[in-house]
Structure formats: C-alpha cells, structure tokens
A protein has these predicted regions:
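Intrinsic-disorder/coil detector with helix-boundary
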Residues: 180, 191-193, 595-664
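Extended, domain-scale alpha-helical bundle/helix-rich regions
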Residues: 69, 86, 115-134, 139, ...
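Short alpha-helix capping/helix-loop boundary micro-motifs
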Residues: 39-49, 284-295, 362, 428-434
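Acidic, low-complexity/disordered segments
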Residues: 313-374, 460-466, 470, 475, ...
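Short, solvent-exposed secondary-structure boundary/capping segments
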Residues: 81-96, 327-345, 386-402, 456, ...
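Structural signature for extended repeat/solenoid scaffolds and their inter-repeat hinge/linker regions
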Residues: 171, 181-186, 190, 369-601, ...
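Assembly/oligomerization scaffold segments
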Residues: 1-110, 164, 287
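Short, well-ordered loop/turn sites that connect or cap secondary structure elements
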Residues: 53-54, 299, 315, 439
Length: 664
C-alpha cells in the first residue's frame, strides 16, 4: 500500500503530484524584513525525481493545527538534492524560500528619477514578473530626484531602500501562494490567524498538547538616548540642517548617550526630523526583546499575539513576532505506513512589545564606488526625464542649469537613463566670481562620488578620448599648452578662441586669438615693455581716445603713411619743432591762415617762389624778380582751400564686465 501524508501533522504539496514527495521533517526560520528559508527532508517511493521538474516551482507545507485546520507555509524551491536510498525510499533535501529570494539572482546597474521608495520597489518587482505583494504604508515619502542601483542584486537594492526609510515586510501564507506585506507602522500587525492569544504554561515541559508557550525570557539592553543627524544642501548652503530626536525610552541614564552621524541623506531640516525619528526608533526597537519556545503552530512573523497566564503580570501584554525558528518531524520517519501520533512541531521565537514601533536594522550595505569613473555629457534630446528640469542652453552643444550642472551618461547605464544634474568642480568658486568652464555635450568627464555614494556624483575633471582628441597632435606639440574653445552653436574647426603657450626653447610664444571681439577694461594703469619690435595691423578703423595727455617718445624715426586724408584738430596751440629741416609738400594747395598774425621768420634767407618769379630776403637785402612787378596796379589775391578737419570718431566702449557680459 503506498505511503500517504493524509494523517500526518506535516505534509507537502508539489507540482509532482500527491505524495510523490513525503515530508519527513523540516526546519527553518522566518523574520520581519528577512527572507524565510525552510529546509525539508523528503522521502519518495516513486522512483527518481527529475530535478528540473521541481527546482524553481511553487510548493506548500501544511501543518495541522490543534483545531485540525491547516497552517500553510508556501514558497519556491531554490535548492533540491538527492542524498541516498534504501529498499523503500529515496531521500531528498529541499530548500523553500519566498519569491523575493529570486531577486538575489538578478543584479543590475540602473538609475531611477523622481520616484518614491514605493514607486521603485513596485517597478523592480513588476519588471521581474512578481505581483504577490501589497503596500500598507501610512507614511509620506518624498520622490527621490536620483537613486542608483549600482552593482547590487535587486534584493539588496530594494532591501536597503526600505531599511533606509524604516519600511519593513513580512509574508502572508496560504495554500499555493504567499504575499509580501510591505508596511511602516504597527497597524500592519494583525493577530496571528487562529492564535490571537497564547498562554504561558511553565509546567507543560514542551508537551505539545495545546498551543502554549512553554518557555519565556525577556531582556533589555542599554541603548543610546538621542539620535542627531546633519547634512549639507548646496542649494541652501547656509542652512543649519542638524536634526535631533530624543528616545522615548528612559532607562539606565541613557539620555546622556548620543549617536551623531553625517550625512543624514536629506535636504531640509524638516526631512531631517523625520529621518532622525526613524533612526531613533530603529535604535529603540531592539532595546527590549522577549525570547521563547512554544508549540504554537500558528505563530507567524509580522503578526501579534497577546501573552496570557504569565506569573509576572506585567509580562501579559501584546507582542509582535519578529523571528521564528520552526522544527517539525514525522515521528516514525514513515517506518510505518500509517501513523502520526509521534509527529512533533515546536518553535523558538523572538518578539517585541507592540507599543514599540518596529524598524528594520540597516543591515544591507549601500554600494561603495571605489574610485572615479568616466561618463559622457549628454544633451536635452538624450535626457529620458526632463520633468521639472530648469536646464537651459544655446543649443544641443551645451545644456546646463543655473548652478552650472550638466547631465551625464555612465557606460554601465545600459538602459540609457542618464544621470541627474551633476555639479562640476571649478578651479575657483566665489560669490559671483571665480572660474567656470561648462562641459559640453559629447565630452568625456571624470566623475567622483561624495563618500563613495553612487547617489552623489560630482564632476572633478575632463579627459580626451579617440573621438574627442587633443587640440594639437601629440607628441609633436608636446611643449604647447593651450586653452582653446569652440564657437557654438554650429561652430567648426576654424571657429574658436584660444590662449596658447609655446614653451619650446628658442620658440617661446604666447598666442591669443579671438573669433570675434576682444575687450579689455583696466580700472587703473596699463604698462607694457617690449624687448624688440611691435607690429600692429588693423584691417579697418582704429580709434583712440585719451582723457588727459598723450605723450609719445621715439628714439629713432617716425614714419607714417596715410592713404587718404589726415585731419588734426587742436583746441589751443599747435607746436612743432624740427632740429634740422621741416618740409611740407602738397600736390595742389598749402593754405596757411591765422585769425590775427602770420609770421614767417628765417635766420638767413626767406624765399617766396612761383615759377620763375621770386622774392628773396637775406642779410644782403631783398630781391624781387618777376616777369612783371606790379605794385598797386590792380589784380587780386589768390585763395586757399580752407581748413575743415574731420572730427575723430569716439572709440567703442569695452565690455564693462557686468553680469551677462557682451553677447552680440
């Protein structure tokens, strides 16, 4: 006659069929915010089991309670093995875990934008095809501007997010299914199904004749009495973000103990108060725990029960089960075809008072970025989520916000989600002064992470690559240093500004090039010293204006050539003095005119000459020679061209350096 689990305390249902695998015993543990795991000892008289038919499948353990109703433990098979056989049975071992465990088999690098913790958890679960979960959240959670899953399993990622936010989870079991309950308050702790109360029975000695607790111990630990956090927000750099939360537990003078930590992972003092309270509750949750053993088959983590009949009346209160170790076995090990009288079940459990809010310990480490990474700056058209973004730029070549932040894409971001706006380290940063160069779209930048936190990137440098090459071929121009820009938008290789230094011995040079205008404004003196020649070429007009005097000294010659007119206006006196000769020659007219007096004075000789006629005055006398000399005999004086010098143009004003600068 085939063996059956029908009359047994424990049984297993699998996709292989009824009683193909007989449950001889199991042990395991479950805990709030922990993956449950049950190790099963199995027997089969049906022949070899194909492992692929059972691994990854859903199975259900049933434990018959004292009222003959079943209590279920449902899960997925993560491990299956065969250990041996005898004349009747082949022995197998099985490990049963929640569907959440499957997320330990996925690891990824992924970026989330403007999502709450519940949004992210839901997205991770749904993307992996898991739907058996529900939220019971009372708290309000702000969207996170930027959240990174970095080289970690999906399970670790959602675990640390929930731990960070004080969110816990446990499982509801039913036949063929288990549901993950995600909660953040004591209201989520319902009474154990079929076990609202549990009596304490010291005399039972572990005899499982009723649902009783047969051992109970309670312990209290001295914990810190205050939690203080602080952080820094570059958008409000002067704000004091320190937040503190005192403990509601007062024991052993714990008020003098304080935990101070940085960073608190918040951006405002109000949010800091919420985080400090969560951290304090996390500290308080473990201050008092009770440990016990029982035969209460309905005990399930995440649920509550009322302790009764304890000899110390203060112990009789409501408790939340936080951890349970289960052990059950078939007494005769199926040595008999029928039975069950020797079957046993017991557990060891840990619980906390219902009055103390449960907060999960932050046990899941956040990934630590070991060093800087490189990334590519992207433009607005490449950005997957621009909601609420205040970035602006002239074109797709530059995309920056008012803080000088740009958006980058990391090489590990296979989804192409891109980063948040990332601050850029500059050489100097003051109040409205300093240095700034904005990384442009397509450039490769060096990204560091504050305290190694993948959620806190900062650009600390820029690097060339095979697509974005150096301005001058190397090593040919290895002695050349330059600061060379590119005109935007649509600028080409010939559109740039540049400040260049050549340090090759004998060829040293400072080169300055502007694509359009060059403005210089000095509030005091300018002094120049040139050791050799100076050349100046102006292809159009040159205007100069001096508010005071203009002094010029030339040791050698002054040679000037004017292609058209030369106009000079003097408001008062015009003085010219030549050490030797002074010669003026005009192709047509020289006109001298004075409002009062014209004096021509010569030391030895003065000559007026027109053609063959002249008047010559010298120390020997005055000679007048002409074809005809007429004195008071009619005729008329010649006329000159007059003097109408053109007024000089005022030079353009240099850019005054005001905010915004010269943009045309």
């Amino acid at each position: 006659m085939p063996y059956s689990q029908e009359e047994r305390l424990i049984a297993l249902t699998t996709p292989l069929g009824e009683d193909v695998l007989l449950l001889a015993g199991f042990s395991g543990h479950e805990g709030i915010s922990r993956l449950f795991s049950f190790n099963l000892d199995l027997l089969s008289e049906k022949g070899p089991v194909n492992f692929s038919d059972i691994i990854g499948k859903n199975v259900t353990i049933s434990v018959t309670q004292y009222d003959q109703t079943p209590r279920y433990l449902n899960g997925m098979v993560s491990h299956f093995g065969q250990s041996g056989s005898d004349s009747r049975f082949t022995r197998y071992q099985m490990q049963v875990v929640p569907w959440l465990w499957m997320l330990t088999r996925y690891a990824d690098c992924k970026i989330f934008h403007n999502k709450t913790v519940s949004d992210i958890v839901r997205q991770v679960f749904d993307n992996r095809g898991f739907q058996d979960y529900k939220f019971q959240l009372n708290g309000s959670y702000n969207p996170m501007e930027y959240c990174v899953q970095y080289r970690e399993t999906d399970f670790n990622f959602v675990s640390r997010l929930m731990e960070q936010n004080g969110i816990f989870y446990f499982f509801q079991h039913e036949e063929g299914k288990h549901t993950m309950v995600i909660a953040d308050s004591s209201s989520a702790h319902e009474a154990c199904p079929g076990q609202k109360t549990a009596g304490y029975n010291l005399a039972s000695g572990g005899i499982d004749d009723s649902d009783v607790i047969n051992s109970w111990s309670i312990e209290q630990e001295l914990r810190s009495g205050k939690y203080t956090l602080t952080d820094y927000n570059f958008k409000t750099p002067s704000a004091n973000l320190t937040a503190s939360e005192p403990s509601v537990i007062h024991v052993g003078g714990n008020n003098k103990f304080e935990i101070f930590d940085f960073p608190g992972d918040y951006t405002s003092r109000g949010d800091g108060g919420v985080v400090a309270k969560l951290r304090m509750q996390e500290e308080e949750a473990a201050h008092m725990v009770a440990n016990g053993s029982s035969v209460c088959r309905a005990f399930t983590t995440g649920y509550k029960f009322d302790l009764e009949d304890h000899y110390q009346a203060s112990m009789n209160a409501s408790y939340v089960l936080t951890e349970i170790q289960h052990v059950a076995s078939v007494g005769d090990g199926y040595s008999l075809e029928h039975g069950g009288s020797g079957d046993t079940y017991s557990n060891h459990f840990t619980c906390i008072p219902l009055t103390v809010p449960f907060r999960p310990a932050r046990l899941t480490p956040k990934p630590f970025v070991q060093g800087p990474q490189t990334a590519i700056v992207i433009g607005k058209s490449d950005y997957s989520d621009t909601s609420g973004d205040d970035g602006a730029g002239d074109s797709e070549e530059i995309w920056v916000d008012k803080f000088g932040r740009v958006v980058v894409r990391f090489p590990w971001d296979r989804a192409g989600a891109c980063s948040c706006r990332v601050r850029v380290s500059q050489d100097w940063a003051g109040q409205g002064w300093g240095a700034i160069t904005i990384p442009r779209v397509g450039q490769e930048v060096l990204v560091s992470f504050l305290e190694g936190d993948p959620d806190r990137p900062i650009i600390t440098g820029r690097v060339y690559n095979a697509d974005k090459t150096v301005p001058y071929d190397l090593p040919d121009f290895q002695t050349r240093s330059t600061f060379k820009t590119r005109s935007t938008s649509g600028g080409g290789a010939d559109n740039y500004n540049e400040l260049r230094f050549e340090d090759k011995i004998g060829s040293e040079q400072i080169f300055l090039r502007g694509e359009k205008d060059f403005d210089t404004r000095l509030k005091n003196d300018v002094r120049e010293w040139i050791g050799n020649n100076r050349s100046l070429i102006v292809t159009q007009d040159q205007m100069e204006k001096a508010g005071g005097d203009l002094h010029s000294q030339v040791t050698g010659n002054v040679n000037e050539k004017v292609g058209q007119n030369l106009s000079i206006q003097v408001g008062q006196n015009l003085y010219e003095k030549s050490g030797m000769n002074f010669a003026h020659e005009a192709g047509q007219v020289i006109h001298l005119k004075a409002g009062m007096t014209v004096v021509l004075e010569a030391g030895t000789e003065l000559t007026l000459k027109v053609g063959g006629n002249f008047i010559d005055i010298n120390p020997a006398g005055i000679s007048i020679v002409g074809t005809m000399v007429m004195i008071n005999s009619g005729g008329a004086a010649g006329s000159g061209c007059g003097s109408s010098p053109t007024s000089p143009k005022d030079p353009d004003q240099a850019d005054d350096g005001s905010k915004g600068g010269k943009m045309n």
